[in-house]
Amino acid sequence: MSRVAKAPVVIPAGVEVKLNGQDISIKGKNGELSRKIHNAVEVKQADNALTFAPREGFVDGWAQAGTTRALLNAMVIGVTEGFTKKLQLVGVGYRAAVKGNMVNLSLGFSHPVEHALPAGITAECPSQTEIVLKGADKQVIGQVAAELRAYRRPEPYKGKGVRYADEVVRTKEAKKK
């Protein structure tokens, strides 16, 4: 039995939940998110909470119920508070700028790197070496942050590259003669 699935997801005021078979959509002040629920999971809406239980005949019912509960909880948090992810650019000449829905990066290549942001994601640059991503969908925020980081991952000798703000880069010692 899943401990995660036993806890209900509380729906705060101002959040509207529509449950239609195995499809669910959650609407709040930061937008609307929808998701298809796994067939092994039964979701019930009672008052201002969502409860989860496995369906009969599925071996992985409790596991899927716990996963579904975590995903729907992230959706509720996303439409109420939203998610943010911070990136830092470390290195001489590494710069970032945002124009519309494009993030322009100078990462030491012979050309500037331009990355288009998906719908629902906004970016801002408090300084030339910081990028702050904001949005309602936790998965998309993480995916965009990983794509930006993949252009120039932190290298292990000097730590230069694009890193998450809370990331600790372990540096190696240089080769000795």
From Swiss-Prot:
GO molecular function, one term: rRNA binding
One example of a Gene Ontology biological process annotation: cytoplasmic translation
InterPro entries referenced in this protein's UniProt entry, alphabetically: Ribosomal_uL6-like, Ribosomal_uL6-like_a/b-dom_sf, Ribosomal_uL6_a/b-dom, Ribosomal_uL6_bac-type, Ribosomal_uL6_CS
Keywords, comma-separated and alphabetical: Ribonucleoprotein, Ribosomal protein, RNA-binding, rRNA-binding
Pfam family, one: Ribosomal_L6
Highest taxon, organism lineage: Bacteria
Disulfide bond sites: none
Record keyword rRNA-binding present: yes
GO cellular component: cytosolic large ribosomal subunit
HAMAP family: Ribosomal_uL6_B
Family designation: Belongs to the universal ribosomal protein uL6 family.
Biological function: This protein binds to the 23S rRNA, and is important in its secondary structure. It is located near the subunit interface in the base of the L7/L12 stalk, and near the tRNA binding site of the peptidyltransferase center.
Assembly notes: Part of the 50S ribosomal subunit.
Name of the protein in question: Large ribosomal subunit protein uL6
Protein species of origin: Pectobacterium atrosepticum (strain SCRI 1043 / ATCC BAA-672) (Erwinia carotovora subsp. atroseptica)
